[in-house]
Amino acid sequence: MNSQFAGLTREACVALLASYPLSVGILAGQWIALHRYLQQLEALNQPLLHLDLMDGQFCPQFTVGPWAVGQLPQTFIKDVHLMVADQWTAAQACVKAGAHCITLQAEGDIHLHHTLSWLGQQTVPVIGGEMPVIRGISLCPATPLDVIIPILSDVEVIQLLAVNPGYGSKMRSSDLHERVAQLLCLLGDKREGKIIVIDGSLTQDQLPSLIAQGIDRVVSGSALFRDDRLVENTRSWRAMFKVAGDTTFLPSTA
């Protein structure tokens, strides 16, 4: 699935990634069924796998380390979100393990520019070649949006968390919409070439209004695996974007 990214420029990779509106939080499923999930997602032409790496220090939970990135099949696009105390070390390890997209927390590192600049020089393997590492910045619900201004030219993905990582306390829908509007206003003419992502315990009912506002992608985990209906739920969530006409992505009928 990721062979179409081989040899593309950073700008072309971002444009192609923007056509995929869903990143699947693969760690939310039952790990014993991981092989089945991956087969189902491949049949659906769903290349983006989202992995939350938590170290128990940045937030209370502990999930997996960079080693887990390398355990996933190379055919997928590995979308890694770092929620760790030492983002520099983790980012290097994730690149070595084959992460294609790496999103840092704005609150997690005083040396964001250094880490993002380094990531901008890295490439990772895909089927048939290599692609540049795509860089993202993520913000907790209470983090001022203007912290991203100095690094806007160093990121391709801007991710707004709708929950407080590790705690599960969610933003009110009205507050989330206001935050999206504020981000779009902040970006202004710099909106082009940026993928805006919402991550955190969204329901399908929330999607239409967020899509209408102009977001590009959502990250979803538990909602997609609910009732052991990954295929049906993935199709349904992706169809919300297709109906809205927000992307050129066409869900597979497999």
UniProtKB/Swiss-Prot annotation:
List the molecular function annotations (GO) for this entry: D-ribulose-phosphate 3-epimerase activity; metal ion binding
Q: Name the coenzymes or cofactors required.
A: a divalent metal cation
Specify which residues bind substrate according to the UniProt entry for this protein: 81, 166-169, 199-201, 221-222
Q: What sections of the protein cross the membrane?
A: 14-34
User: What positions constitute the catalytic site?
Assistant: 52, 199
InterPro entries registered for this protein in UniProt: Aldolase_TIM, Ribul_P_3_epim-like, RibuloseP-bd_barrel
**Compartments where found:** Cell membrane
Task: Tell me how the cofactor is bound.
Answer: Binds 1 divalent metal cation per subunit.
What are the binding positions for a divalent metal cation in this chain? 50, 52, 81, 199
The enzyme's E.C. designation: 5.1.3.-
Q: Which family does it belong to?
A: Belongs to the ribulose-phosphate 3-epimerase family.
PANTHER family annotated for this entry?
RIBULOSE-5-PHOSPHATE-3-EPIMERASE
Q: What is this protein called?
A: Putative epimerase LsrE
**Species of the source:** Salmonella typhimurium (strain LT2 / SGSC1412 / ATCC 700720)
